[in-house]
Regions:
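Membrane-proximal intracellular helices of multi-pass ion channels
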Residues: 1-240
Length: 240
């Protein structure tokens, strides 16, 4: 009887931890949805209706899925996070969210399948700089803007994960002992452990991005080119 109760408690705790992971993953999806608004606007203004349709589909699905994840994890969102939970959510951000991010990429000329779009999205969000879009000059502005935004968002996530996930383990020699970025309560939730460094890093990241766009535009480049080059530069993806 005790063993049965213990197994039931362990199962309930596992479900609670899964809920906390899904809740945090939902916020990552919400960030993707917000970023999709930019290339959707570019598609409408430029008359790229095929891209506008894909971005509308992607935005709708991403918003729905993200909302469902957040709602499903609400009851367990305050569960204290373990270090393994931080590592798990980092992997989910990098390899699950690209499924949603790849939907608009399927209308790109050089993306021949959904798996190719997924690979492109993973490459951008992990800031690896790879991908299947080798000749950006053949792609329309909405695709280039979306690829730049994915790399930019991936760069932001990489900085946050470096502080919240890698630094506590001193992975790669990274150590921020005593830094206010690592300060948190012992019973801090997963969303709180990631949210604190996000709130500190994001304003500087955004400010540098805006300065980069202004600098590129001042050099005589068009707005879309300046936007894409600035975002790829700040994120470190190196795409154009």
């Amino acid at each position: 009887c005790r063993a049965s109760v213990s197994c039931q408690s362990a199962e309930e705790l596992a479900n609670m931890r899964l809920g906390a992971l899904l809740y945090t993953l939902g916020y990552g999806g919400a960030m993707l949805a917000l970023c999709m608004l930019v290339p959707l606007f570019v598609s409408i203004v430029g008359g790229h209706w095929a891209h506008a349709r894909n971005f509308t589909m992607g935005l709708t699905l991403t918003t729905f899925v993200s909302g469902a994840l957040i709602i499903s994890g609400l009851p367990t969102r305050r569960l204290p996070a373990r270090n393994i939970d931080l590592l798990a959510v980092m992997l989910l951000f990098w390899f699950v969210l690209p499924i949603l991010a790849s939907i608009p990429l399927t209308s790109a000329i050089q993306v021949r399948s959904f798996m190719a779009g997924y690979f492109e999205a993973v490459s951008s969000l992990t800031t690896s700089g790879g991908g299947v879009i080798i000749y950006p000059q053949f792609e329309d502005a909405p695709i280039l803007v979306w690829r730049a935004l994915l790399g930019w968002l991936g760069g932001l996530w990489t900085l946050v994960f470096a502080v919240a996930v890698l630094a506590p383990f001193a992975i790669g020699g990274l150590s921020l002992v005593g830094s206010p970025l690592l300060q948190h309560d012992e019973d801090a939730a997963l969303s709180s452990r990631l949210g604190r460094p996000m709130r500190v890093i994001f304003p500087y990241y955004l400010a540098l991005t805006i300065l980069g766009v202004i600098g590129m535009a001042a050099g005589g480049n068009g707005f879309v080119s300046s936007f894409c080059m600035a975002l790829s530069g700040i994120s470190g993806t190196g795409t154009s």
